[in-house]
Amino acid sequence: MAKSIPKTGSRKNVRIGSRNQTRKIPKGIIHVQASFNNTIVTITDVRGRVISWSSAGTCGFKGTRRGTPFAAQTAAGNAIRTVSDQGMQRAEIMIKGPGLGRDAALRAIRRSGILLNFIRDVTPMPHNGCRSPKKRRV
Protein backbone atom coordinates (compact mmCIF):
# COMPACT_ATOMS: atom_id res chain seq x y z
CA MET A 1 0.00 0.00 0.00
CA ALA A 2 1.33 3.43 -0.92
CA LYS A 3 2.09 6.02 1.75
CA SER A 4 -0.18 9.04 1.80
CA ILE A 5 1.51 12.36 1.14
CA PRO A 6 0.61 14.98 3.77
CA LYS A 7 -0.97 18.21 2.59
CA THR A 8 1.28 21.27 2.63
CA GLY A 9 -1.09 23.20 4.86
CA SER A 10 -1.75 20.38 7.31
CA ARG A 11 -1.30 20.95 11.00
CA LYS A 12 1.57 18.53 11.46
CA ASN A 13 3.90 20.32 9.06
CA VAL A 14 3.32 23.88 10.23
CA ARG A 15 5.23 25.17 13.24
CA ILE A 16 2.94 27.55 15.08
CA GLY A 17 5.41 29.50 17.22
CA SER A 18 9.15 29.69 17.44
CA ARG A 19 10.57 27.91 20.46
CA ASN A 20 13.21 30.47 21.39
CA GLN A 21 11.12 33.60 21.70
CA THR A 22 13.10 36.54 23.00
CA ARG A 23 10.56 38.35 25.13
CA LYS A 24 11.31 40.98 27.76
CA ILE A 25 11.07 39.57 31.26
CA PRO A 26 11.58 42.28 33.91
CA LYS A 27 10.89 40.04 36.93
CA GLY A 28 11.34 36.33 37.58
CA ILE A 29 11.84 33.55 40.09
CA ILE A 30 15.15 31.70 40.46
CA HIS A 31 14.79 28.15 41.80
CA VAL A 32 17.98 26.56 43.17
CA GLN A 33 17.79 22.84 43.95
CA ALA A 34 20.98 21.79 45.73
CA SER A 35 21.36 18.09 46.43
CA PHE A 36 24.53 16.36 47.58
CA ASN A 37 25.15 15.07 44.05
CA ASN A 38 24.15 17.98 41.80
CA THR A 39 22.84 21.56 41.73
CA ILE A 40 20.02 22.56 39.36
CA VAL A 41 19.18 26.24 38.74
CA THR A 42 15.85 26.97 37.01
CA ILE A 43 14.68 30.48 36.15
CA THR A 44 10.96 31.07 35.57
CA ASP A 45 8.75 34.08 35.05
CA VAL A 46 6.25 35.05 37.75
CA ARG A 47 3.62 32.71 36.26
CA GLY A 48 5.98 29.73 36.58
CA ARG A 49 6.90 29.23 32.91
CA VAL A 50 10.53 28.12 32.51
CA ILE A 51 12.77 30.65 30.77
CA SER A 52 16.19 29.11 31.35
CA TRP A 53 17.78 26.32 33.33
CA SER A 54 21.21 24.92 33.98
CA SER A 55 22.80 22.27 36.14
CA ALA A 56 26.30 21.30 37.13
CA GLY A 57 26.05 18.30 34.81
CA THR A 58 25.16 20.40 31.75
CA CYS A 59 28.08 22.72 32.52
CA GLY A 60 30.48 19.82 31.97
CA PHE A 61 31.03 18.50 35.49
CA LYS A 62 30.83 14.72 35.86
CA GLY A 63 30.64 12.38 38.82
CA THR A 64 31.32 13.70 42.30
CA ARG A 65 32.48 17.10 40.97
CA ARG A 66 28.83 17.99 40.26
CA GLY A 67 28.15 18.37 43.98
CA THR A 68 30.93 20.91 44.57
CA PRO A 69 30.32 24.60 45.29
CA PHE A 70 32.30 25.64 42.20
CA ALA A 71 30.02 23.56 39.97
CA ALA A 72 26.96 25.23 41.54
CA GLN A 73 28.48 28.67 41.00
CA THR A 74 29.12 27.85 37.33
CA ALA A 75 25.58 26.51 36.84
CA ALA A 76 24.00 29.61 38.40
CA GLY A 77 26.13 31.95 36.31
CA ASN A 78 25.29 30.01 33.16
CA ALA A 79 21.53 30.20 33.78
CA ILE A 80 21.59 33.90 34.69
CA ARG A 81 23.63 34.90 31.65
CA THR A 82 20.76 33.98 29.32
CA VAL A 83 18.04 35.82 31.26
CA SER A 84 20.07 38.97 31.81
CA ASP A 85 20.23 39.26 28.01
CA GLN A 86 16.41 39.14 27.99
CA GLY A 87 16.24 42.09 30.38
CA MET A 88 15.59 40.56 33.80
CA GLN A 89 16.28 43.10 36.55
CA ARG A 90 14.43 41.79 39.63
CA ALA A 91 14.13 38.27 40.97
CA GLU A 92 13.00 36.18 43.90
CA ILE A 93 15.08 33.19 44.99
CA MET A 94 13.70 29.85 46.18
CA ILE A 95 16.41 27.55 47.57
CA LYS A 96 15.69 23.87 48.13
CA GLY A 97 17.90 21.09 49.44
CA PRO A 98 20.82 20.47 51.80
CA GLY A 99 23.67 20.44 49.26
CA LEU A 100 27.00 22.23 49.22
CA GLY A 101 25.97 24.38 46.26
CA ARG A 102 23.37 26.46 48.13
CA ASP A 103 25.66 29.28 49.23
CA ALA A 104 27.83 29.22 46.13
CA ALA A 105 24.83 29.54 43.80
CA LEU A 106 23.44 32.37 45.93
CA ARG A 107 26.80 34.15 45.80
CA ALA A 108 26.89 33.86 42.00
CA ILE A 109 23.35 35.23 41.71
CA ARG A 110 24.17 38.19 43.97
CA ARG A 111 27.25 39.03 41.88
CA SER A 112 25.26 39.02 38.64
CA GLY A 113 23.67 42.41 39.32
CA ILE A 114 20.04 41.26 39.49
CA LEU A 115 18.12 42.93 42.34
CA LEU A 116 16.74 40.38 44.79
CA ASN A 117 13.32 40.89 46.38
CA PHE A 118 13.63 38.03 48.85
CA ILE A 119 15.38 34.73 49.44
CA ARG A 120 13.16 31.89 50.62
CA ASP A 121 14.22 28.44 51.83
CA VAL A 122 11.64 25.94 50.57
CA THR A 123 13.41 22.74 51.65
CA PRO A 124 10.74 20.12 52.40
CA MET A 125 10.81 19.11 56.06
CA PRO A 126 8.80 16.08 57.22
CA HIS A 127 6.54 16.42 60.24
CA ASN A 128 7.34 12.83 61.29
CA GLY A 129 6.28 11.36 57.96
CA CYS A 130 7.95 8.39 56.28
CA ARG A 131 10.75 6.55 58.01
CA SER A 132 14.14 7.81 56.85
CA PRO A 133 16.60 5.37 55.25
CA LYS A 134 19.18 3.67 57.46
CA LYS A 135 22.52 5.38 57.96
CA ARG A 136 25.46 4.38 55.78
CA ARG A 137 28.25 2.34 57.35
CA VAL A 138 31.53 3.01 55.59
From Swiss-Prot:
Signal peptide: none annotated. GO terms for biological process: translation. It is found in: Plastid, Chloroplast. GO terms for molecular function: rRNA binding; structural constituent of ribosome. Its main location: plastid. InterPro entries: Ribosomal_uS11, Ribosomal_uS11_bac-type, Ribosomal_uS11_CS, Ribosomal_uS11_sf. Residues 1-22 are annotated as: Disordered. Gene3D superfamilies: Ribosomal protein S11 (3.30.420.80). It comes from the Eukaryota. GO terms for cellular component: chloroplast; ribonucleoprotein complex; ribosome. Coiled coil: none annotated. Belongs to the universal ribosomal protein uS11 family. Part of the 30S ribosomal subunit. This is Small ribosomal subunit protein uS11c. It comes from Phaseolus angularis. The gene is rps11.
